[in-house]
Amino acid sequence: MIMTTTPYGSWKSPITTDLIVADSGSLGQIELDGDDIYWVEMRPQEGARNIVVRRTPDGMTTDITPTLFNVRTRVHEYGGACFAVSDGVVMFSNFADQRVYRQDSGGEPRPLTPEVDLRYGDGVIDRRRNLMFCVREDHTVEGREAVNTIVSLDIENGGEGTVLASGNDFYSSPALSVDGTKLAWLTWNHPHMPWDGTELWTAEVNDDGSLGNAQMVAGGDEDSIFQPEWSPDGTLYFVSDRTGWWNLYRLTEDGPKHLVAMDAEFAA
């Protein structure tokens, strides 16, 4: 074997970048649809592309997202929930154009939102009304700060979406009750970050998808709330740091009720 002497740091190493990232894939957002489990999987061997994967009860996994798509949203720049699924129908944000696409089971994705500078995320599907409630971020006016709103998006005919909640700087986490009659969401304003202070709002969902009786039910400038979720019986649960620790709470007629008082953080 011939030995070659080269300056320090200039030799050809057997440890390549491809070798380092080959097994560094990661799993993200997880959703349930009946007995099926869906999740986002980052594929380093495919240029760090994100795809939706489905696992059925028999243990079989299937890549749902076609090759030319990358499931990722740029809402809030940090990103967020980038897909939703109901009855086998997957709605997702594509990273390249930030449009929302609908993909029926076994079918190809078709765009629902127009080719304008709008971003969507945190979607939840309402099959009874054929809507998806989600965050929309409007970047269509150059030089203006992006406008965040909660919108309903027609999952059959598409469009830009109908604005349901607006006026604050940021919105996130729309959550639809199991019976489809109520919607909860989070909102906050500059200069706060969501880990500083957020407001939890709820509203009744009318038959046409519009909202009524919207009201703030918890939170504030010094109370960071996240992960609002409805139980099957219509109770709203959420995490709040009003004690200095992110603990679990339940919304009652008398306001938030502390479920577990611990010097510990709770989150999914």
For the regions a language model picked out, list residue spans one by one.
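Residue-level detector of Asp-centered blade-edge/turn motifs that repeat once per structural unit
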Residues: 32-34, 85-87, 126-128, 178-179, ...
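Generic structural signal for coil-to-beta-strand starts
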Residues: 36, 89-90, 130-131, 181, ...
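Short loop/turn segments that connect beta-strands within beta-propeller blades
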Residues: 56-59, 104-107, 154-158, 205-209, ...
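Beta-strand-rich domains and repeat architectures in extracellular enzymes and scaffolds
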Residues: 5-55, 70-84
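Predominantly a core beta-strand signature of beta-propeller blades
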Residues: 5-8, 17, 60-63, 99, ...
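A flexible loop/linker signature enriched in serine peptidases of the S9 family
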Residues: 41-51, 71-77, 92-100, 114-120, ...
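Repeat-blade elements of multi-bladed beta-propeller folds
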Residues: 80-88, 130-136
